[in-house]
């Protein structure tokens, strides 16, 4: 009778949506898809904010922008977001430094809000010159890292992402793949690296939070075994 009772365990708790899948490869795919759509959504939202400065990659018409020549920009941002979001927890595991600072969704959402606020400031606040704009946004971006990350790997990846993304963007502009509508290209270059840095930190935090559920499932399974 005791054996019969042990063979019929109670209902298992599945937890969050990503925890209900036990395959690591499927978990990786789910996290990548989620990060991709988050990146696409943020790209569209931040582009709408930049319309105020007339430096957007899209035409002012929001509906027509989806079908414009720059339709590929949001998917590219989504792909980059997926890569960044998956890379951050992977680097943490390889370095043996699991990120434990402010690991909850409320902190992640505040990080997203601050990132959007930094982008909004670059579009709405008037600065005397481009140097003042660059220094202000750099301070805000580093403040975002210090408030929501504080990891050496996060800072290093953020700097690398900002440098690489800025170089790729400049190459695309110089080769005529697309161009900004603003005549003041120096203004665009003054805030671009800071936005990329803050975006890398933000997507890294989202990726870490999503990966945390997979770690919980693995720990629960090993404990049950």
Swiss-Prot record:
It is found in: Endoplasmic reticulum membrane. Changing residue 136 to A: Decreased binding to 25-hydroxycholesterol and subsequent interaction with SCAP. There is a cross-link at residue 215 (Glycyl cysteine thioester (Cys-Gly) (interchain with G-Cter in ubiquitin)). Keywords: Cholesterol metabolism, Endoplasmic reticulum, Lipid metabolism, Lipid-binding, Membrane, Oxidation, Phosphoprotein, Steroid metabolism, Sterol metabolism, Thioester bond, Transmembrane, Transmembrane helix, Ubl conjugation. The keyword Lipid metabolism applies. Changing residue 200 to F: Decreased binding to 25-hydroxycholesterol, leading to decreased interaction with SCAP. The chain crosses the membrane at residues 29-51, 71-88, 104-126, 130-148, 154-175, 190-207. Changing residue 132 to A: Abolished interaction with SCAP without affecting binding to 25-hydroxycholesterol. Belongs to the INSIG family. This is Insulin-induced gene 2 protein. It comes from Homo sapiens (Human). The gene is INSIG2.
């Amino acid at each position: 009778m005791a054996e019969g009772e042990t063979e019929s365990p109670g209902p298992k708790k599945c937890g969050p949506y990503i925890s209900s899948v036990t395959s690591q490869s499927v978990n990786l795919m789910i996290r990548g898809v989620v990060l991709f759509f988050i990146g696409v959504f943020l790209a569209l939202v931040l582009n709408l904010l930049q319309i105020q400065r007339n430096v957007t990659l899209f035409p002012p018409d929001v509906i027509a922008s989806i079908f414009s020549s720059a339709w590929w920009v949001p998917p590219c941002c989504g792909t980059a977001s997926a890569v960044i979001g998956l890379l951050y927890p992977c680097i943490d595991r390889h370095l043996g430094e699991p990120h434990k600072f402010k690991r909850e969704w409320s902190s992640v959402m505040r990080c997203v809000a601050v990132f959007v606020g930094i982008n909004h400031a670059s579009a709405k606040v008037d600065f005397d010159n481009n140097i003042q704009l660059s220094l202000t946004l750099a301070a805000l971006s580093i403040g975002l890292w210090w408030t929501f990350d504080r990891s050496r790997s996060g800072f290093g990846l953020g700097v690398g992402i900002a440098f690489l993304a800025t170089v790729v963007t400049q190459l695309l502009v110089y080769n005529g793949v697309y161009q900004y509508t603003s005549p003041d290209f120096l203004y665009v270059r003054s805030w671009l690296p800071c936005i990329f840095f803050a975006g890398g930190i933000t997507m890294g935090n989202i990726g870490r939070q999503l990966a945390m559920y997979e770690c919980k499932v693995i720990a629960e399974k090993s404990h049950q075994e």
